[in-house]
């Protein structure tokens, strides 16, 4: 819940003292803090385990207002100014001092003269990919000020609190931070502006670091990640050596449309999230950072005289050189922003040009059309002005398109609306978003190379309903783009998480199965080839691909390359025309047994629980006690089945064992039930099991108990055994190696064979609840699961009087059903 931290409280270990009072304000001794609330796909489970504190997460406006009222500066409890917000892999050898901008310089400003790409200079962190995306973002003011909300400053209503907005897996989230920034020798350690007293880029980097858990989490990545987080767009990758002939036209249209573009040169290494782009480990990176800082200590003359304003350019610390600088000035393994495309006249011929920016704010291309190129004298003066040519070391430069495709290897384009790049017309695409999860042992089946489990992956039906409007194309074709994105892998790096290798396949659904939302089974994928698929499985946050297929119904199967890898994802489908994309979900139901003859049905406790509707939770009436206490109620005797010639040997065996254990009252408790069942089950040599546990037997009694006595008579026991026998057959069918266990991936089919039809979330929950660490389910757990399913379905149906699939319970009824199950 929100916490007020007293100004007299000591800072955390390793943290520098941070000012907490308003500038020139004598009143107010505190820092207002807020906490977030959890969420997730399994809301019923998560909500059950989250303390109900009665306080909602406070918004930026609420926190800002409270800080102003109390005259305190905001201090973020979720991202505190200490080493926990910096690095997680190891401790930094020197002490950073966290300072607010008014402590770093006089006259701090949030934005000076509008935010532009020259305001971004990389510091001592390997997040050039993120800064390259910021540079692209500054080219589109509408997008920029969605990420960076207006009306934030260090003068009017300053309270040490700022906020930024990012797209996060389908939603826009508002990230609130304080303005404490890590410094060394009174200089910002990480991203800084070209102006010493401008701080929007440093604060934006801090908000993005908070979103991912730490500054270290931003080390190494692809520009497309940040581009998508800034826009909610979808990214397409181009290997420049395999680029289409009209690549320049594609890039030109992307710039005109406001799309963001980044590019890079492969450094010959397999870059992963565990290392910096050249494979430099975090310890080596930190060591170089320390050397870098020591070599660039500020002289006394660099400090701002007291009372003087400072809008001088920042004295730049050269970034750690873990990328490889080439003789031409370009840097391998480094991310650049594409900030413009033009055609210029040179010696009577048109030359295609590309403008790029290095987020370091320095280190530029030194070939043709670079800032210091000797042949600029042959370029017309008006042409120079149009190209804004100036000889400055600001990290931005022109180069010819021919040189661009010769040196660069990758191009990333983030399309804001997924407009068709191949078309001269701008076309608005429709989009559908689906969230999903791979659960180990249930729905993490791996790629097509693993046919035994591939079919268990989440499946999404795609209905392409209308063909494209293209008069030049005679084919009846639907264009669409599929983008698969894995969630939270960067944030979970500190827990050892890395990006999975992911991809997807698309299959056409046979006409006879159109409209059928059933999960496609193993045999379908064994005998049907995919109609389309991602070009490769790759360890990137998102894999996207364009396709052209005829109108029909398809199923998309997203997967990791290897099975048993657990994680969350979102699947987005963009199409030129109307489409429908949804997860394949079975209707939750249970097959009701068909009665062969008229018999009086057994009435179970769960069927009669609604007779207690009039009772309150705190009532202790005799009626309530009689219904719940076996000591208060005498059980009416049940007629025993006659011992006829037709009675099987097994039934006679049961009767004899039951009589021996039950005694004169012919009723058994959970301990006695365990004894009976295990004596009978042990005679089945083909069923390898250690028998039933006491807890399983208690659940069985709760299922079959017809009067709330907590005991079973022979009739109830006989009915229970019939169910166990039918479930035993199913178990033996899937226990193909006769190990006494079944693979958890087979549980979906086993549950279905027993007449229970569940959706994907419930199959995931069953695996989490009943499978062991080897993803196996033993016989006892198997029966326990089926007993629970039978009981819960029966209880629900008893309360669902009108059959609309919705029930209403009071707290007593709810507790009766859940505690006695």
Curated annotation (Swiss-Prot):
Skeletal muscle. Keywords: Calcium, Cytoplasm, Hydrolase, Metal-binding, Nucleus, Protease, Repeat, Thiol protease. The active site is at 128, 334, 358. Residues 73-417 form the Calpain catalytic domain. Residues 624-638 have a biased composition (Basic and acidic residues). It catalyses: Broad endopeptidase activity. Residues 1-34, 603-652 are annotated as: Disordered. GO terms for cellular component: cytoplasm; cytosol; myofibril; nucleolus; nucleus; plasma membrane; protein-containing complex; T-tubule. The keyword Nucleotide-binding does not apply. Residues 418-586 are annotated as: Domain III. Residues 641-652 have a biased composition (Polar residues). Ca(2+) 1 binds at residues 662, 665, 667, 672. InterPro entries: C2_III, Calpain_cysteine_protease, Calpain_domain_III, Calpain_III, Calpain_III_sf, CAPN3/13-like_C_EFh, CAPN3_PEF, EF-hand-dom_pair. It comes from the Eukaryota. Ca(2+) 2 binds at residues 705, 707, 709, 711, 716. Belongs to the peptidase C2 family. Homodimer; via EF-hand domain 4. Interacts with TTN/titin. Interacts with CMYA5; this interaction, which results in CMYA5 proteolysis, may protect CAPN3 from autolysis. Interacts with SIMC1. Interacts with UTP25; the interaction is required for CAPN3 translocation to the nucleolus. This is Calpain-3. It comes from Sus scrofa. The gene is CAPN3.
